Amino acid sequence: AQGLPVRFELMDYRQFNPDGKLRFDRVASIGMFEHVGHKNYRQWFGMVRRSVHEDGLCLLHTIGKNRSGTGIDPWIDKYIFPNGVLPSAAELAASAEDFVIEDWHNFGADYDRTLMAWHARFEAAWPRLKHQYDERFYRMWRYYLLCCAGTFRARDNQLWQLVLSPRGQPGGYRRPLL
């Protein structure tokens, strides 16, 4: 970001912009919402709401699950994402009531292929890496990638990308064509 009008801040989102004095055209959250916890969803959406301009947009990119009230896998909780929580569609929608959901895209089926590609690359790189890591790490990382791929292949987990606006985009939101 050198030379760009960008500023990075490392902080707890709950301490960001408490008085709402800062306003942004766009807010993006990628791979973070899984660590918010369902008890804090409304607080997170409140922080975004007071931080985005009335005509601004928020991009929320998160892994989610199909059913509310189910916990995270104990192994994932212990070794990969301690205290991680996957939101359900119902939990997201209920918590985002102060926004218009302009777009909700599901990349879940694609994420299975992504995880399998990561697994293939990990296997191919392992001969170069095995001197830096032990056999336990190898087994755990394979287990993580393959189990996660299985949850997406079974369509139990999803990868969602939501575009939210405070008041709705005049004429409706149009996703940019790639």
Regions found by a protein language model. Give the residues of each.
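General small-molecule cofactor/ligand-binding pocket signal
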Residues: 7-11, 102-105
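Short glycine-enriched loops at secondary-structure junctions
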Residues: 12-14, 62-65
